[in-house]
Amino acid sequence: MLPPFDEFGYLPPGIHACGVQELIVRFGNGSPEREVETQELIDFFAWARNAGIQRVIVNGSYVTAKTAPNDVDIVVLPGADYPRGEPTCDQQEARWPFLQVFVAADEADLEEWSLRDFGTDRNRRAKGVVEVLL
C-alpha cells in the first residue's frame, strides 16, 4: 500500500511498490489531465509486459498531490529478451505524448535514476517514486 503524502504533497523518500490497479486508484482521477495520463499509462504498462520490461519506476507530478500534473516521468529496466518482437520504447515515443520514458542500462542505473535523479524536486527536497509491479 502506498504511503500518504507529506506536507509538500510528495510521497516519502524511497521507492514505493504497488500494482497497476493501486496506482490507478490513487493517482488516476481528479482532473482531465490525470485521466488522460492514466489512459496512456495503462497502454504503456500493457506494452511493457509484452516487451519484456523487468521494472518500471513512475515519477513526476503524476505521483504527487498536484491536481493537474504536466506529465509522467518513467524509467524502465528492460529484461534480457526485450523487446520480444514489440517496437522498442524509442519507436513508441509518439504513442504516449504525456509520458517521458528513460531506459536504464542496468539495475544500478535504475537505482540511480530512482533515488538520485527522480528522488528530489527542483528545490532538492527529497521525495518518493513508485515502482509499478507488472
Task: Tell where the protein language model's regions lie, with residue ranges.
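Catalytic core of pol beta-like nucleotidyltransferases
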Residues: 1-55, 59, 63-69, 78-134
